[in-house]
Amino acid sequence: MRIDALALRNFRNYDALNVTFAPDCNVIVGENAQGKTNLLEAIVYLSSARSPRARAEKELISFGRSECSIKANAFARNRDFLLEIALAAGRRRKILINKVPVKKGSDLSDVLGAVYFCPEDLLLIRDGAAARRKFMDDALCQLRARYAQALSDYHRAYEHKTRILRDSEEYPSLLDTLPEFDLRMAQSGAVIIYYRARFCERLKEYAGIAHRECSGGREELGVEYQTVSTISDPLAPIETIYDQLCAHQASHAAAERASRMCLSGPHKDDIAVTIGGVNARQFSSQGQTRTAALAFKLAEREIYREITSRTPLLLLDDVLSELDPRRQEYVLNRILGGQVFITCCEEDRLGTLLSGKVFHIADGKVV
């Protein structure tokens, strides 16, 4: 898969941009705050209708403007696609694939897949559990439409239940509606756990391989999925996981009402990471945790390849400058194959790249 051409209008700091890309490597050079990351964000958004940075879609619209658009000519599954997204303040976004309106971001993921790697991802191992849940969610929402729907359903039910518990002291009758939201959370939560567990099994294998190669085989990377305590086997069928989630809800019902907090469900999931058998988050060095984070992102790309038999777009947002020369060389050797986008401040850092195009960005323009 690849993006051949991209057009932006009123997107972030781009008033208007029209650019054509190479099918292999695209190096985007520029000083900080010129629009390099914004360009990669637009590509990621085209692959999933999810921004890796913005909390709200209105943040994507240029300051002082009321609407923006992203368009791309793409090639995937042996055919051409025209992808279009239009955002307007106060209105629902519009997504079109070959001029046909679609409602879900997962429809875009059926065309394009993207693995986005930014400097913040190097903290993936040391950050809190929310960062590792986001890592799983970002990967799985592109791979499994059912997962994306379950995650959306779960978040809605979780928010409703949280409000009910919070307001129940003042309005006790609200508690009568809790069983409905418990049911919804158990149904969607079982799907989430089912797919996360399988993702982590593949992550263990592929990240382990990448970590051994990058570390010279000196250390072993351990990966273990952690979820609700009553789930005896996260790899069990969804029906079994659902029953065990219901049991966990029942055993925590009184505590939830007393604390007015939602205590049961996969919203507290985590990935336990060890390096050489030692808790990586607590005891590993910065270099060790960066190597592990690098292995996670490279593994994400391999998992996508395995499941879809296609190579996703790879976007490296100023990551190489954060790595030592040995890790830089390892990454550059591993990204061969498929379309790649790399941002950097200095072009000479990428002298080992043999083919592709170089773009110089300044103030939201290609110069």
Predicted regions and their residues:
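Conserved lysine of the Walker
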Residues: 36
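Long, charged N-terminal accessory/stalk domains
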Residues: 123-124, 130-179, 183
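Conserved NTPase motor "head" modules and their coupling/switch loops across ABC/AAA+ ATPases, GTPases
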Residues: 1-31, 172-313, 322-326, 330-333, ...
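Structural recognition of the conserved hydrophobic beta-strand(s) that form the central parallel beta-sheet
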Residues: 72, 339-345
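Nucleotide-state sensing region of NTPase/ATPase domains
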Residues: 48-125, 129-131, 137-147, 204-209, ...
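Post-Walker A helix-loop "phosphate-sensing" segment adjacent to the P-loop in P-loop NTPases
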Residues: 45-57, 299-307
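Walker B catalytic acidic pair
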Residues: 317-319
